[in-house]
């Protein structure tokens, strides 16, 4: 666990509408539609902080991680984070979303299919910046400033 100077009790959700079995054109259309949906209801989902992230995730239908456009949403509470997860899982066929807490960067995967209930899996470690030159292994995120992040 790490401690930051970020505001307390904020959840960040990393979410994508991409699917590895779809072409780039379809994935970009899905990405734009998801961003519009999120921005249209900030009270429900929180605020879109960046649409310019690259995530490398492994989908259940894929044997290896794939890179995809990713959005960072700042949620004021757990309910908003769950709403983002539910949107991703129901509308965009996502396996889960990554949620991390603002001050400690503790992270977990959240799956919320259907209209109620959810599953959360806490990940060992915390969502941390990876130093330049250090290798990236497995799943990671590159933010809008080119910084590399990973749960470690």
Swiss-Prot record:
<keyword id="KW-0456">Lyase</keyword>
<keyword id="KW-0808">Transferase</keyword>
<comment type="subunit">
    <text>Homotetramer. Interacts with host METK; this interaction induces the polymerization of METK into filaments that are enzymatically inactive.</text>
</comment>
<keyword id="KW-0244">Early protein</keyword>
<keyword id="KW-0949">S-adenosyl-L-methionine</keyword>
<dbReference type="Pfam" id="PF23780">
    <property type="entry name" value="S-AdoMet_lyase"/>
</dbReference>
<protein>
    <recommendedName>
        <fullName>S-Adenosylmethionine lyase</fullName>
        <ecNumber>4.4.1.42</ecNumber>
    </recommendedName>
</protein>
<comment type="function">
    <text>Degrades the intracellular SAM pools of the host cell and inhibits the host S-adenosylmethionine synthase METK/MAT, thereby preventing methylation of the viral genome. Induces the polymerization of METK into filaments that are enzymatically inactive. Keeping the viral genome in an unmethylated state allows the phage to shift from a lytic infection under normal growth conditions to a transient lysogenic infection under glucose starvation, by blocking its own expression. Does not protect the virus immune against host restriction-modification systems.</text>
</comment>
<dbReference type="GO" id="GO:0047625">
    <property type="term" value="F:S-adenosyl-L-methionine lyase activity"/>
</dbReference>
<dbReference type="InterPro" id="IPR016290">
    <property type="entry name" value="S-AdoMet_lyase"/>
</dbReference>
<dbReference type="GO" id="GO:0016740">
    <property type="term" value="F:transferase activity"/>
</dbReference>
<keyword id="KW-0945">Host-virus interaction</keyword>
């Amino acid at each position: 666990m790490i401690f930051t100077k970020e505001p307390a009790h904020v959840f960040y959700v990393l979410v994508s509408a991409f699917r590895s079995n779809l072409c780039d054109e379809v994935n970009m259309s899905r990405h734009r539609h998801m961003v519009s949906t999120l921005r249209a209801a900030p009270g429900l989902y929180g605020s879109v902080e960046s649409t310019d992230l690259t995530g490398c995730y492994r989908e259940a239908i894929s044997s290896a991680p794939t890179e995809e456009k990713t959005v960072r949403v700042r949620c004021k509470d757990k309910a908003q984070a769950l709403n983002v997860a539910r949107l991703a899982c129901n509308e965009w066929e996502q396996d889960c979303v990554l949620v991390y807490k603002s001050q400690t960067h503790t992270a977990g995967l959240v799956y919320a299919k259907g209209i109620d209930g959810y599953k959360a899996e806490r990940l060992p470690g915390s969502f941390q910046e990876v130093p330049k030159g250090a290798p990236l292994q497995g799943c990671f995120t590159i933010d809008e400033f080119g910084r590399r992040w990973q749960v470690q």
